[in-house]
């Protein structure tokens, strides 16, 4: 994917902005609170229909305005598309090439964006649910079918849990089959994704910090290195049977992919407990790079890589190494308080001050 232009209207501190992006590295610099991160937030909202900074999109409406409007012109496989979103107090309106999108599940994957943010450490420090969500979002960007599978699994899980609470044995039995069918596929797809990410992650990490890194998907349903869907389904059936008494005691389903974990270790130690802040930020940055490589290699998808406030959390040595990696990933947008001096001739540099964006240098625009 190549993003050609971004238009903002009454979004955050921008009354109006039209930004033409270069095809490779786009570096945006300026003092704090000038509007740098707002540009990345707008791109992220177009990708997923939600913000990484607030749970309420109406908070992004510029003070005194009734709504905000974001639009991007981009191309995939040399075909141009337009994607826009308008948000007001009544809700949001999303258009793709002029046609309305009414479900966010249909939006995911149309405009793939991978975001690295200094504040986004929940994948490393957060609960297992955060890491499961990380895998689910990556798989959803690659395939709309996965979004449907995970939704069907959670529907079956919710129905089974409701039946457990009322001790409705007949309904529990009825939901076991769809729970096993959808859950087994979710577990297999996550496992395969994590396995491929591990190899990519190791290669990228070895090229930067020369430390031993491991990423693996841990599931009670998967007991072999190369599981089949039937293997997982058989294990799930047996584990549900054995967990019946425990499920009734606790009031919910205790086995399944909703209990699985993505384990990340550095030098055989959990990164959440034994890594420095610098290591965590470097690891997270490389993990985002690995997502891009995974989408490119497995699905021929070239997402936009966005990196926010990079000088705040990465030292110059790590920055140089990561920027060297980014040259092979396609289009990238970064923000920083420091004017970049490490970029090559294929870069576009923008300066932001009080919501005014000016082009400093570019060989493309």
Swiss-Prot record:
Residues reported in the UniProt entry to bind ATP: 30-37
Disulfide bonding pattern of the chain: none
Main location: cytoplasm
GO cellular component, one term: cytoplasm
Keyword set, alphabetical order: ATP-binding, Cytoplasm, DNA damage, DNA repair, DNA replication, DNA-binding, Nucleotide-binding, SOS response
Molecular functions (GO terms): ATP binding; single-stranded DNA binding
Any Pfam family hit: SMC_N
InterPro entries: DNA-binding_RecF, DNA-binding_RecF_CS, P-loop_NTPase, RecF/RecN/SMC_N, RecF_2
Source domain of life: Bacteria
GO biological process terms held by the UniProt record: DNA replication; DNA synthesis involved in DNA repair; double-strand break repair; SOS response
Signal sequence region: none
UniProt-annotated location(s): Cytoplasm
HAMAP family assigned to the protein according to its UniProt record, in alphabetical order: RecF (MF_00365)
Physiological role: The RecF protein is involved in DNA metabolism; it is required for DNA replication and normal SOS inducibility. RecF binds preferentially to single-stranded, linear DNA. It also seems to bind ATP.
PANTHER family, per the entry: DNA REPLICATION AND REPAIR PROTEIN RECF
NCBIfam families found in the cross-reference section: recf
Family: Belongs to the RecF family.
The name this protein goes by in its record: DNA replication and repair protein RecF
Lineage of the species this protein comes from: Bacteria, Pseudomonadati, Chlamydiota, Chlamydiia, Chlamydiales
């Amino acid at each position: 994917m190549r993003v050609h232009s971004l238009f903002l209207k009454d979004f955050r501190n921008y009354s109006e902005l039209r930004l033409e992006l270069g095809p490779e590295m786009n570096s945006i610099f300026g003092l704090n609170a000038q509007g740098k991160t707002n540009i990345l937030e707008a791109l992220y909202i177009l990708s997923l229909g939600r913000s990484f900074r607030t749970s309420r999109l109406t908070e992004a409406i510029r003070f005194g305005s009734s709504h905000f409007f974001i639009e991007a012109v981009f191309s995939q496989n040399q075909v141009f598309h337009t994607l826009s979103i308008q948000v007001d107090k009544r809700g949001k309106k999303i258009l793709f090439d002029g046609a309305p999108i009414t479900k966010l599940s249909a939006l995911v994957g149309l405009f793939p964006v991978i975001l690295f943010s200094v504040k986004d450490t929940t994948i490393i420090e957060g609960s297992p649910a955060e890491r499961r969500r990380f895998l689910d979002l990556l798989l959803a960007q690659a395939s709309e079918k996965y979004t449907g599978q995970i939704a069907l699994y959670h529907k079956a899980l919710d129905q089974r849990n409701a039946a457990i609470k009322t001790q409705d044995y007949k309904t529990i039995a009825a939901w076991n089959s769809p729970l096993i069918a959808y859950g087994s596929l979710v577990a297999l797809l996550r496992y395969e994704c994590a396995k491929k990410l591990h190899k990519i992650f190791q290669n990228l990490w070895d090229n930067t910090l020369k430390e031993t890194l491991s990423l693996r998907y841990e599931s009670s349903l998967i007991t072999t290195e190369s599981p089949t869907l039937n293997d997982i389904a058989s294990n799930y059936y047996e584990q549900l049977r054995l967990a019946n008494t425990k499920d009734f005691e606790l009031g919910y389903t205790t086995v399944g992919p909703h209990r699985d974990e993505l384990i990340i270790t550095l030098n055989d130690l959990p990164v959440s407990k034994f890594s420095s802040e610098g290591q965590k930020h470097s690891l997270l940055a490389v993990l985002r790079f690995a997502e891009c490589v995974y989408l490119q290699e497995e699905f021929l998808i070239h997402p936009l890589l966005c990196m926010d406030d990079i000088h705040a959390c990465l030292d110059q040595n790590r920055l140089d190494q990561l920027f060297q990696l980014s040259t092979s990933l396609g289009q990238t947008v970064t923000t920083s308080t420091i004017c970049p001096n490490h970029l090559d001739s294929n870069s576009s540099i923008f300066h932001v001050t009080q919501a005014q964006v000016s082009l400093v240098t570019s060989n493309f625009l």
